[in-house]
Amino acid sequence: MACMAWETGPRARFTPTVRNAAGSGAIGLIQFMPSTLKSMGRTVEQAAAMTAVEQLDLVREYFEPYRNRLHSLSDVYMAILWPAAIGKPETSALWTQEGRPTTYRQNSGLDIDGNGVITKAEAAAKVRATLEAGMQVPYVYEGPL
């Protein structure tokens, strides 16, 4: 839930039609890239026409290949952002300003310490903050089940 809350943003929380503001073409609850949807036999238009509940089935399908490899919140987010980092240490560099300048630039907002290296921990920090905020009153249901 924290990953979807982060990916859809504060103004469109859990909206399945939200599109990436940077123009990547990504859409939906986990910001599916057009190429990812194509590999799943779907189109951006089909994903955009889904309700949140319908898109959750697509999210489940997307995560299926990773199901036994996700052991932390960071790993779950890496399945969305950079699957090659699943299972790697939190200190692992995802992108560097020198090594992958374009990818670094596209994600430079995740470089918390501004050192030109985006680590797995840095990339997941905003998702973790979203999770922690979501665990605060008034978001936590404490009524009868």
Language-model regions: role of each:
Residues A125-L145:
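Low-complexity, Gly/Ser/Thr/Pro-rich intrinsically disordered linker/tail segments
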Residues V117, A121-A123, V127:
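A recognition module on extended beta-rich or small alphabeta surfaces enriched in W/G with H and D/E
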Residues M1-D113, K120:
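Catalytic glycan-binding domains that act on GlcNAc-containing polysaccharides
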